[in-house]
């Protein structure tokens, strides 16, 4: 589903992608690729991790 910002997506999702190809995607799960949370809530490659997980230095979710 196309989105302009995270507000266009449901709970547990973020808006990710390039400027013309943005879509809602589920928050990243343990062991899956992620993008670290940022102040602007702008994500190009993936979503932040689900609650209780952190995005590791190699951009994969893992338990805290």
Swiss-Prot record:
UniProt entry keywords in alphabetical sequence: Disulfide bond, Secreted
Tissues expressing the protein: Expressed by the venom gland.
Any single Gene Ontology cellular-component annotation: extracellular region
Keyword Ribosomal protein among record annotations: no
Broad class of the protein's primary localization: secreted
Disulfide bonds: 3-15, 9-24, 14-47, 34-55, 49-61
Places the protein is found: Secreted
Keyword Cell inner membrane: no
Function: Non-toxic to mice and insects.
Family: Belongs to the u-CNTX family.
UniProt name for this protein: U9-ctenitoxin-Pr1a
């Amino acid at each position: 589903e196309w989105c302009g910002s995270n507000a266009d997506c449901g709970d547990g999702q973020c808006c990710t992608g390039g400027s013309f190809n943005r879509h809602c995607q589920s928050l990243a799960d343990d062991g899956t690729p992620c993008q670290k949370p940022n102040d602007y809530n702008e994500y190009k490659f993936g979503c932040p991790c689900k609650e209780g997980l952190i995005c590791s230095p190699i951009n994969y979710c893992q338990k805290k």
